[in-house]
Structure formats: C-alpha cells, structure tokens
Amino acid sequence: FAFDGSANNPYLPEHIMAEDVVYTGTHDNDTSLGWYQSLTVEQQQIVLNYLIAHDWKQEGDTCQMPEDLMRLALASSAFLAIIPMQDLLRLDGHHRMNVPGTVEGNWQWKFDWSQVNEQYCRDLQTQLQQYGRLH
C-alpha cells in the first residue's frame, strides 16, 4: 500500500509510529515477491527510487524482493513486525494463500520444512539482531 509514488502516503516506513504493527502481507494479498512481479516497470521504479532516496539502495542497484520489504518492516519503529512465511521463504505469487471473492484454489498452500534455506535463517537472525527485534 505504501509505494504509490506519493510522499504523503501514510503507509510509508517513515510514517510508521512505535504503537503500530507493520507487515509485508496478509493471507488476503499476494506474496511480496508476487506483488512486485505484478507491478509495471514504472511502478517497480517507484519502489526502487524510494529505496535509493532513503539510503537503502545505491544508484545502479536493483530491488531484491521480498528482502527489501522485509528489511523495511524490521527496521521500522513499529512495535511489531509481521513477515508471512511465504515472504520469509522468498516465494512468488504461486504460493499465495487466498484471493478474496473467489471460491476455488484458496487455502491450498502449506508450509514444508524442506522449503527452509539455511542462508535465509542466517539472514533473518542477522536482521532481527540488527534491528533490535530479538527479545
């Protein structure tokens, strides 16, 4: 919801307050990677421009989804950051949980331990430590 190109968008990371809950997705929307892949080139550029303008990326870098959104969520001042399992596993839209208003194909995705990548676990632990989210 945040990356529509408006600097006044209330969902941008800099507008998140300490008492807020931030999340990269819910059961009712696409995975972060699926969302990003569905954007037009122009919309993807808006996301990248935001990341560059806020020193998350350098000129010439590319977006790394869902990693970039996960870092923004974890680095936010929100009390709670929620990352769906599909984002933690870097899964695309084929792993979406639910499409509201449809009756077929929903709630089919199941987590499997074989999907866990050791590097993803190390990256997550590093970010949780870096952003003070290990308690």
Stretches with model-predicted labels:
Residues 1-135:
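Catalytic cores of glycan-processing enzymes that make or break glycosidic bonds
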